[in-house]
Amino acid sequence: VVATLAWTWFMLSQTPDVEARLHAELDAVLGGRLPTLADVPRLVYARAIIDEVLRLYPPVPFLSREAGKDEEFQGQPIPKGSVIVVAPWLLHRHKKLWEQPDHFIPERFLPGGAGAPSKFAYVPFSIGPRICAGMAFGQTESILCLAILAQSFRLRLKPGTNVQPICRMTLRPGDALPMTAEPRTVVAAAPGAAVAAFAPAC
């Protein structure tokens, strides 16, 4: 979650249009109050941002599995005991699988968007029986943390900072990500007013 949020703040600092759309959703859904678990299904753009960050910067960029029996893949024998490497970093950026794979486009994960071309093309938490047990918790925590902070602040990358991915157990933006928190004005709902669900235009 920590690495995912770090990448999220970095990407938001580079894409003011995405940041503005996120703030519009937070103001519409929350109206100045703190988010709760019940708000998560309505924070659809916040979820799309997290999903897109996980596509570009999967927590574990390379996965390894051991073949439990002799197999064959496209004519290539895979003996039992072979170590098979799966690279989410490459899958998530493959131009045959994704449109504009190197661009940060959260809209692809909105309802009605292109989404993942297949369940095997988007595996930030692995897939199958070895999928990360904390996937749902991690996604929910990321959305709530993003909503809490982004509602009150804009984070700006320190000028001149060169951000390079490094992998130390998880993929992170270097050893440090110096940013400045700028307070923002929250559009609060009137007392007792109902806040309409945010419906992003695709």
Kindly give the residue locations of the regions a language model identified:
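Conserved cytochrome P450 K-helix/beta-meander segment immediately N-terminal to the heme-binding cysteine loop
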Residues: A20, V40, D70, V86-A114, ...
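Cytochrome P450 heme-thiolate "Cys pocket" and heme-binding signature region
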Residues: L34-P41, F62, Q74-Q76, R93, ...
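Active-site proximal loops enriched in glycine and acidic residues that flank catalytic Cys/His/Asp
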Residues: R65, A87-W89, R108, S126-I127, ...
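Cytochrome P450 catalytic-core helices
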Residues: V1-E25, M135-F153
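Conserved cytochrome P450 K-helix E-x-x-R motif and the immediately C-terminal K′/meander segment
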Residues: G32-Q74
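C-terminal domain-closing interface element
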Residues: A46-F62, G174-C202
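Beta-strand segments within the central parallel beta-sheet cores of soluble alpha/beta enzyme folds
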Residues: R21-D27, R65, H103
